[in-house]
Amino acid sequence: MAKSKAYRAAAEKIDPAKAYTASEAVELARETGSSKFDSTVEVALKLGVDPRKADQMVRGTVILPHGTGKTARVIVFATGPAAEAAIAAGADEVGGDELIEKVAGGYTSFDSAVSTPELMGKVGRLGKVLGPRGLMPNPKTGTVTPDVARAVSDIKGGKIEFRVDKHANVHFVVGKASFSPEQLSENVGAALEEIVRLKPSSSKGRYVQKATVSTTFGPGIPVDVNSI
């Protein structure tokens, strides 16, 4: 597949033989982002874990200090006072059986889903719709909780989820190209700190084996893992 002229121009600014520090990489990502729109800045890590082993599954959340640059659409499965609290917290859509049926019909125009524990028996049946998209509420990520209002506030405030895939890679968003270098660096630092904190005790050898920073449709910028 041929690369675009803009991609090639961006790639020419990157020294493939160099491993950049995290701060250098985000600065370069800002420079190589698209001039036509505010590119999303992403980080990809290769971890020294075996995701096939249950005790080496790295999964968690972190609230980025400067948010993601995007206002997340959040739906909440809740009724009664919990539903009222979710609405007050700014949830985009709240409901019980009707919302569950809507999602069962294929509705997925949202970025995150939260549920009260009481409704998870019904929400759990939405696995075929929500599971492949990474949208299924989960206690481990704080999206199955009695305090749905706080969950909504956290997500709207820049909370991101990350999860190692079957190839031991982790991808996550750290902001927009319009962010300052300091904002991006602090977001990257917060995410990396949490991922490193979650290193499985059974993982041996180097934990973060490879790291790259990139923008939407942009080339990957190699990061020196020793700077992480």
Swiss-Prot record:
Gene3D superfamilies: 3.30.190.20, 3.40.50.790. The keyword Lyase does not apply. The keyword Repressor applies. GO terms for cellular component: large ribosomal subunit. One of its GO terms (biological process) is translation. Belongs to the universal ribosomal protein uL1 family. Binds directly to 23S rRNA. The L1 stalk is quite mobile in the ribosome, and is involved in E site tRNA release. This is Large ribosomal subunit protein uL1. The gene is rplA.
